[in-house]
């Protein structure tokens, strides 16, 4: 067994994506589905690609996504976000760390939203546009990816997930992978 990456050995035991899952670094994911549940603290569960546990975004991150994508959750499906562990997130009066969005699809320039930090105190939170995957790099990598998929070494979803760690793929690029 290779020790190339030990990220899987430090994941917390939980049914959801946690800030501790992101200690090794940020992840860029696509929202594949979502549902509302009867939990007042975490009423939204978003399924994300890449083999990750479901993400239950906090109120502030739900507000960011609503400010950018609107309040119809169906429009969020297919959207991409880069998630990171922010160690300064306060919960219960103490810095506990939490999941924040650094980049989001659907915007062409950085966007700042005022979010409630504590009662009566609002702070700006800025998200950046999702960078696009470099077209020349895509053209160079596509034959290698398709060969790996044909050989059964990777699935199309594996390739898309890994590629989107470098930049958002267009729908046309995604269709070319594994074709």
Regions found by a protein language model. Give the residues of each.
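OB/S1-fold single-stranded nucleic-acid-binding modules
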Residues: 1-20
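Short, contiguous, well-structured surface segments enriched in hydrophobic/aromatic residues
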Residues: 22-67
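Short connector loops at helix/strand junctions that flank enzyme active sites
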Residues: 26, 41, 76-80, 94-96
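Short, surface-exposed beta-strand/loop "edge" segments at domain boundaries and coil↔beta transitions
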Residues: 52-57, 109-110, 123, 168-172
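Short nucleic-acid-contacting surface segments enriched for D/E, G, S/T with interspersed K/R
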Residues: 67-82
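OB-fold/S1-family single-stranded nucleic acid-binding modules
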Residues: 89-111
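Interfaces that engage single-stranded nucleic acids at replication/repair/recombination sites
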Residues: 116-179
